[in-house]
Amino acid sequence: MAPPSVFAEVPQAQPVLVFKLTADFREDPDPRKVNLGVGAYRTDDCHPWVLPVVKKVEQKIANDNSLNHEYLPILGLAEFRSCASRLALGDDSPALKEKRVGGVQSLGGTGALRIGADFLARWYNGTNNKNTPVYVSSPTWENHNAVFSAAGFKDIRSYRYWDAEKRGLDLQGFLNDLENAPEFSIVVLHACAHNPTGIDPTPEQWKQIASVMKHRFLFPFFDSAYQGFASGNLERDAWAIRYFVSEGFEFFCAQSFSKNFGLYNERVGNLTVVGKEPESILQVLSQMEKIVRITWSNPPAQGARIVASTLSNPELFEEWTGNVKTMADRILSMRSELRARLEALKTPGTWNHITDQIGMFSFTGLNPKQVEYLVNEKHIYLLPSGRINVSGLTTKNLDYVATSIHEAVTKIQ
């Protein structure tokens, strides 16, 4: 008799929640259905948007007979890496001028986080540092915990961030947790448009955060998934990163071009490394090359070419910033409209946090039972945490969503 399958004992894993939500939405025949769970931009017609500048650059690339499908270098397309790091740090960055910046092209922001985490587990502040505490915000994007765990870190902790009572930033809790963190701990920071809360520190608050991190010798690992997409202004959205450079920090910054270029399925990311001197950057990149080689060997070219072509051409860059502002402005408009409708309905509670928050997501303050009501009774799909994708709102579904939220809050405590 043949033995059972070698896979017979493999347990069924739980589905990834945000993707399951979208699958459930697609299967729902109800005409009123609204998807506020998806982590991607939508137009006012609820469609994905291919940026006009991306279409233009794709055509340009298709017509360029000098291009081929040869392997890229292990660390990626040099022009892309340079342009991406410059976008985060700014043209006048002292770190760039002093040649103490390196970049690694990655498979999206997640790939940048993973390569950075793998490197830190092996080489940060010595060797084999898997017992170094890694701090993530409470709450945070769920993949942060998973990526650092998969890299081998054994001590992942949270720092206070969201104050549910006031629906805003718990700055004092945040600072206290940093103050009490062991020296040389790694701290994951959202550069802008915090996911899932949409609440960002002000520049003055960032200065306080940097001050504590500096005297505790904490290592910043920025996650920058929304530059330009949060406020519509590239410089404003990179303020924290650039301030940390000015304060002399060494740090990593995982960049994603999924949102601000709409290149979700091209997996375009970059890990920017800022060090103290050029020599250390060369050493870091030499080790990252080894890690990339056994992870994805080398990255795909198409998305990187699109981003590099756009960022390096002044005319295309200007068009791109206009496209980004179009997306950011629509989201800001939907925030205002949702808040206005909830206040007009006299929905219990305060709703100013919707417009105080920034970026694609809003932490509504709805509890899991209210979310369950919206999903099951109203066919409005959102995460159990109450996080919504504001770009899932449109001029056509706003009234329905607002009255449904009003019902959920009024009926269910």
From Swiss-Prot:
Molecular function GO labels: L-aspartate:2-oxoglutarate aminotransferase activity; L-cysteine transaminase activity; pyridoxal phosphate binding
Protein localization: Cytoplasm
Catalytic activity annotation: L-aspartate + 2-oxoglutarate = oxaloacetate + L-glutamate; L-cysteine + 2-oxoglutarate = 2-oxo-3-sulfanylpropanoate + L-glutamate; (2S)-2-aminobutanoate + 2-oxoglutarate = 2-oxobutanoate + L-glutamate; 3-sulfino-L-alanine + 2-oxoglutarate = 3-sulfinopyruvate + L-glutamate
Keywords, alphabetical: Amino-acid biosynthesis, Aminotransferase, Cytoplasm, Phosphoprotein, Pyridoxal phosphate, Transferase
N6-(pyridoxal phosphate)lysine PTM sites in chain numbering: 259
Enzyme Commission code(s) on record: 2.6.1.1, 2.6.1.3
InterPro entries tied to this protein: Aminotransferase_I/II_large, Asp_trans, NHTrfase_class1_PyrdxlP-BS, PyrdxlP-dep_Trfase, PyrdxlP-dep_Trfase_major, PyrdxlP-dep_Trfase_small
Biological role: Biosynthesis of L-glutamate from L-aspartate or L-cysteine. Important regulator of levels of glutamate, the major excitatory neurotransmitter of the vertebrate central nervous system. Acts as a scavenger of glutamate in brain neuroprotection. The aspartate aminotransferase activity is involved in hepatic glucose synthesis during development and in adipocyte glyceroneogenesis. Using L-cysteine as substrate, regulates levels of mercaptopyruvate, an important source of hydrogen sulfide. Mercaptopyruvate is converted into H(2)S via the action of 3-mercaptopyruvate sulfurtransferase (3MST).
Family: Belongs to the class-I pyridoxal-phosphate-dependent aminotransferase family.
Protein name as it appears in the record: Aspartate aminotransferase, cytoplasmic
Organism: Pan troglodytes
